[in-house]
Amino acid sequence: KYNKLANTNKIVILNTPNTKGNRDDYSFGDEENIMMNSLLKYSDLMVTMFSTMQIEAALFDLPVVNYALREIADADYKSTRLDPQGVMKMPHVSRILQTGGVKAATTFEELYSHINDYLDNPALDSKGRKIIEENFVGDFMGNGSEKTADYIHSLLYT
């Protein structure tokens, strides 16, 4: 259904990542990393279903609309825990939503409205995206291993 959407709408670009490995242990090649960075830098908007990529999007101040539409859910969400709207209640997702830096749509009407709002005003919710950057990214600057070791050391010797 996503391919059909992309094939029938010129403005929709569907990117399917080229990964190496299996579902539990995969990585992106250099070309895929370049493509992903280009998408983040040059896109007008990201539409996703609560992907962690919304954190990277915040680094580029890229507006994000998440969708949780039961009408297009592949699973029987009434008898399983795969309710697309249930994802919004997961702690790691709700913390992102609480920043006000992204939008979530539970109906097609909301989806269209949020998309149009961001296309009309890309700066909308920019302050919230800055909060995502500050709260979820951190200052690693190439010394993440050292900071991790220092933290473990502090736990052991305090």
Q: Which role fits each region the language model picked out?
A:
Residues Y2-I55, L59-F60:
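Donor nucleotide-activated moiety binding/catalytic core segment of transferases
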Residues Y2-L5, Y118, L155:
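Hydrophobic helix-cap positions at the C-terminus of alpha-helices
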Residues K1-K4, K10, K20, K41, ...:
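Context-gated lysine
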Residues T52-D139:
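Catalytic binding pocket for nucleotide-activated donors in carbohydrate/polymer assembly enzymes
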Residues I34, E109, G142-E146:
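A structural signal for well-ordered alpha-helical segments within the folded catalytic domains
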Residues M141-T158:
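C-terminal alpha-helical cap of glycosyltransferases
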